[in-house]
Design a protein with these regions (language model features):
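Nucleotide-activated chemistry modules centered on ATP-dependent adenylation/adenylyltransferase
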Residues: 1-177
Length: 177
């Protein structure tokens, strides 16, 4: 399971564990900016890993330059690029490890483009010959929020890239005006 952050992973992990599905996590998020935010989210996943004794592989790569080069002048399509970048590597890793399938914690967030995530996951599954596990975890979003507070996990305020940070705070500022 691609883990975008500790908070979003909580409900999907609980749900899949309840179905007796073994989970191998993958931290791969070069889309998270700035570096201090990237580090806080990484440390939060590491904290969750210790508390819940999770099996997680880390691809610790801060990819600001690569991300910006890929999305410049295509900012409106950046989310699809971001999903593709992460789910492609997740599918490739799952196939290499001979796992039964792959999924992502992104499927829990009501703020993500759910249908696009599903489409990218299916495409990567076909490309790498490994099933993409689809489940709508969004009904557990608030459960995950409460659990993350109980566990004392860092709670981010925007999706990840500097564009989403700008949109979040710019919209908040506009709402005050």
């Amino acid at each position: 399971m691609h883990i975008c952050c500790a908070n979003c992973s909580l409900y999907p992990l609980q749900t899949l564990f309840a179905k007796n599905i073994d989970i191998k996590g993958l931290w791969l998020n070069p889309n998270i900016h700035p570096y201090t935010e990237y580090q806080m989210r990484l440390e939060s996943v590491q904290k969750l890993q210790k508390v819940w004794n999770l099996d997680i592989e880390y691809v610790d790569h801060y990819g600001l330059k690569e991300f910006l080069r890929a999305v410049v002048n295509k900012e409106d399509d950046r989310c699809v690029f971001c999903y593709t970048m992460r789910l492609e590597e997740t599918a490739r890793t799952a196939k290499k490890m001979k796992l039964d399938g792959f999924t992502t914690s992104l499927l829990v967030s009501p703020y993500q483009k759910f249908d696009k995530i599903i489409a990218v996951g299916q495409e990567m599954g076909k490309r790498y010959g490994i099933p993409f596990y689809e489940e709508d975890f969004r009904q557990g979003w608030k459960i995950g929020i409460n659990l993350s507070k109980d566990l004392g996990l860092y709670r981010q305020k925007y999706c990840g890239c500097i564009y989403s940070e700008m949109e979040r705070y710019l919209n908040k500022q506009r709402a005050k005006s």
